[in-house]
Amino acid sequence: MTEIPADLHYTEEHEWVRRTGDTTVRIGITDYAQSQLGDVVFVQLPDVGSELTAGSTFGEVESTKSVSDLFAPITAKVIAANGDLDSDPQLVNSDPYGEGWLVDLEAASAADLDAALNDLLDASGYGDATD
């Protein structure tokens, strides 16, 4: 059974979203996703300052099994990327909801972020999607 924390939002593309402030979120891939990928060997992330559009690709996770695209869960600007993944991409496997985070994003406004998060899955909905 994979871990699905109740306090996060989820996408059908297996990303998690944690609200970190009025207009900010942290993004990563779920425990289910990392278990399906196998050993992660490389993570390609966008540059800080990049503008992401909800539903568009923003990077890749490469594992011993495959290369998978990362999809932006919300429209926002990249304010941080996890540089630790350059030297230790396996953090995505060992701690997908903690040290294995991918990017921090900032939405244009709290209202925009509220609306975007309302469109995502909750833990129960994501659990149903992975059964």
Curated annotation (Swiss-Prot):
Superkingdom in the source lineage: Bacteria
One GO CC term, this protein: glycine cleavage complex
Protein keywords: Lipoyl
Listed CDD domains: GCS_H (cd06848)
Co-factor binding comment: Binds 1 lipoyl cofactor covalently.
Transmembrane segments: none
Classification via Pfam families: GCV_H
PTM-bearing positions, type N6-lipoyllysine: 65
Co-factor(s): (R)-lipoate
Record domain Lipoyl-binding: where: 24-106
GO biological process, one term: glycine decarboxylation via glycine cleavage system
Biological role: The glycine cleavage system catalyzes the degradation of glycine. The H protein shuttles the methylamine group of glycine from the P protein to the T protein.
Family the UniProt entry places it in: Belongs to the GcvH family.
Record PANTHER family: GLYCINE CLEAVAGE SYSTEM H PROTEIN, GLYCINE CLEAVAGE SYSTEM H PROTEIN-RELATED
HAMAP family: GcvH
Subunit relationships: The glycine cleavage system is composed of four proteins: P, T, L and H.
Protein name: Glycine cleavage system H protein
Provenance organism: Mycobacteroides abscessus (strain ATCC 19977 / DSM 44196 / CCUG 20993 / CIP 104536 / JCM 13569 / NCTC 13031 / TMC 1543 / L948)
Gene name of the record: gcvH
